[in-house]
Amino acid sequence: MPDVLSNDLLQKMDAYWRAANYLSVGQIYLQDNPLLDQKLQLDHIKPRLLGHWGTTPGLNLLYVHLNRLITEHDLDMIYITGPGHGGPGLVANAYLEGTYTERYPAIERSRNGMQRLFRQFSWPHGVPSHVSPETPGSIHEGGELGYSLAHAYGAAFDNPNLIVACVVGDGEAETGALATSWHSNKFLNPARDGAVLPILHLNGFKIANPTVLARITPQELTDLMRGYGYEPHFVEGDDPAVVHQTLAATLERVLGEIRAIQDKARNHGDTERPRWPMIVMRTPKGWTGPKQVDGKPVEGTWRAHQVPIADFKNPEHLTLLEDWMRSYRPDELFDATGKLRDELQALAPTGRRRMSANPHANGGELLEPLSLPDFHDYAVTLTGPGALKAEATRVLGTFLRDVMKNSLESENFRLFGPDETASNRLDAVLQVSPKEWMAAIEDVDVDLSPDGRVMEVLSEHLCQGWLEGYLLTGRHGFFSCYEAFIHIIDSMFNQHAKWLKACATIPWRKPIASLNYLLTSHVWRQDHNGFSHQDPGFIDHVANKKSNVVRIYLPPDANCLLSVADHCLRSRNYVNLIVAGKQPEWQWLDIDAAVRHCTTGAGIWHWASDEGEPDVVMACAGDVPTVETLAAVKLLREYVPDIKIRVVNVVDLMVLQPSSEHPHGLDDRRFDELFTTDKPVIFAFHGYPWLIHRLTYRRRNHVNIHVRGYKEEGTTTTPFDMVVLNDLDRYRLALDAILRIPRLADQRDAATSRYWATMQRHKLYIGEHGDDLPEVRDWRWSA
C-alpha cells in the first residue's frame, strides 16, 4: 500500500496524536503542574485516580486521522465512540480543536486552562469520565456498551451528506445489541441516506479478559464481517509510523468506496444493496503507555484498561508516570503559554467541520418542527359516551399516516417498530410510505422498498438505537411496541433518560424532539398469547426517572389517544410513554371533551357520576380499567340504588404526584377536589397497583385509596378472565366499593356471596364455551 502521508505530515500528525494522548493522561492523573514545568511531585497527583486509559490512544489515533480526511476532502463527519470510557480522549480532542473552550470559556487554551481541564475530569463538580453530554461532539456516552452502531445508523438516516465514523470496541462487540446492529446496513439506502464507517478496534482485552473477536483467526473475522455484508479493511501494528501510513491509506480507500457506492445509487440508479466498507484496527491496548509496572506487563494487556499506574506512595510509580508523560515531549506540542503550537493547530478542521462542533452532534441546532395535521380531523364522532366501539391505535394510524405524508419532503420523521406496525394497527402509514428494506425482495412481499420510511426489524434494541440516533441528530420519530417486550430495552431507555436529564443542565445543548413510545397489544388483551406476553411493568420503570424528563399517558379511548399523540409529537426533551389498546373498545369522549380531559390530566366524568358528596370514588387509569370501572358503576347502582358515586379518570399518570414532585402534579387542593379527603377510593389501574400507592402516598386521603391492577396472574384465556384473575373485574370493583362504604356494612356478607357466585358462574361458562359470559361480552354503557 503506497504511503499517503509525506514525512512532514506524518511527523505533525504523530505530534498531534501525542498531544491528545498527553492531555488524556493528564486528565486521569494530574491536578497541577500541567506542562511538567516542575519535577512531578505527589501533590500534583489527584487523590483519587479515575478514568480509563486502555482504549484512549486508539480513539485519539483515529480522531487525528479522521481530521485529516475531513480537512482534505471537506467532509461532514461525526464521531461515535462505542468504548465511551475513553472519555479523556474525546475531551482532549475537543480541547485541541478549540470547541471545548468555546463551550466552556473557563477552560481556556493556556497553562491555567489546561490545569483546569485536568483537574475537572472525574472530579466533584467537574465532568464525568465517559463521553457524556458535557463533551462537545458527543451523541453517545458509551457508558453502557452495545449501542454505538445503532446510534450511528440512526444518525445517518436521511442525512445524505453525513459520514458517521463509529468505533466499535472489541469488548462491546460481544453484546447482543451490537451483534445485531451490524445488520443495519440492510436498511441504509445510499441514494438518500448518509454513510456509516464502522471501525472495529481490536485492542484485545476487556477489563480482565481477552475479547472473542481478537482471538479468532483473521480469516474467521473476515468471513464474519463479509457475512454481515461489509468489506473489511485491516490496519494492524504497534509501530506508530507504520500504523499512521497504513491507516491514512486505508481511510482514503474506504472513502473512495463510500463515494463510489453513493454515486452509483444517486447518479446511476443502482438499487442493489452495496457491500459497505469497514475497518478492523488492531493496535495494543494502552498503546504508548508504560510497558511494565512492578514487573508485570501493562501495554498490550488487560492491565492497561483503567489506571495503569496507581499507589503513588511508591516513589518509583511517580517516576514512572513522569517518564510516561514526558515521553510525549510536551514542550514540542505546546508553547510556553500552554497553547497548542500553530503548525499542529493547522491540522484540525475549523468551524462546523470540527467533529466536536458539528451541528449533527447537537441535533437541536438542526431541529425543525413537524408539519402536523390537525388531529381533530381524525376524531371518532360520538353521539354520547359509549355510543360505539373503535380501535384506538387504528384511529391513531390514520393520523400518523398524514404526519408521515407531511414529512415526505422534509424527510425528518420515521416510524419504528419490531415487526409490529400492522399488528399494532398503525398500518395506515403504509399507504404513504412502505417499509425500508435493502435486502432481497420477493414476489410474495408487500410494502417493502429501499425508499421506505417505516423502520421494522425484529430487534427492539435496533429500533430504540436507530430512533435515538435519529432524534439526537435533529429529527422526529415514533416507536410502537408490544407492551411486554419493550422491557428488552429497559436499559437503553435508562441511558437515554439520563442523557436528557444531563442535557437539561447544559446551556449549549439545544432541545431535541422527544422519544415517543406507544405500547399496545397490552397486558389486558394478550389473552390469546398468554402469560409471557403480559407485563405492564415498563410504566414503573419510566416512573423511576427524573420528573423533568418523563411523561406517562394512559388514554381511555381513541380521541384521547389522538390528543396525547399530537402533544407528544410537539414536545421536546422528554420521554413520553403512551399505553393504549388496539382492540375494539367503547369510546367515551368526543374530541373537544378529550382535549379538555387530556389537558388537565385527570377529571371527574360527570356524565357517569352523581352530583354532590360521593359515598365512593371510582377511579381508573387505562382503557380496560376504564371499561371495568364504568361497568362496576352500573352494577353498584343496581345493587345499591341510592349510592352516590364519583367517577374519576386519569390520563396523565404524573398528575397523581404532588406538584412539588412533578411539574404535572396536582396541588393538594385540586387533588382533594377529585378524590375527596375522607371517602373510599377504588382505583382500577392498568399496571402494577403499588405504583399508584407510590405516587399518592403523600396525599391526605391516601389511607382510603384501594388499588386494583395487574398482580402477575395470567394465561391463555378469555379477555374478561384476565381481569378476573387479577381482581380487576367489574364484580370485584363493585364488591370493593361496598366493603369500604361504612353505611353499607349490613350488605357486605350478601355482596360477598353474590360476588363468589358470579365468579363460579363465570368460570364454569368460559370452561364450557371458551368465551365470556354474554352479559360481559355484550355489555354497554347506558346513563
Curated annotation (Swiss-Prot):
This is Probable phosphoketolase. Its EC number is 4.1.2.-. It is an enzyme of class 4 (lyase). It comes from the Bacteria. InterPro entries: Phosphoketolase, THDP-binding, Transketo_C/PFOR_II, Xul5P/Fru6P_PKetolase, Xul5P/Fru6P_PKetolase_C, Xul5P/Fru6P_PKetolase_CS, Xul5P/Fru6P_PKetolase_N, Xul5P/Fru6P_PKetolase_ThDP_BS. Pfam families: XFP, XFP_C, XFP_N. GO terms for molecular function: aldehyde-lyase activity. HAMAP family: Phosphoketolase (MF_01403). The keyword NAD does not apply. Belongs to the XFP family. One of its GO terms (biological process) is carbohydrate metabolic process. SUPFAM superfamilies: Thiamin diphosphate-binding fold (THDP-binding) (SSF52518). Keywords: Lyase, Thiamine pyrophosphate. Its cofactor is thiamine diphosphate.
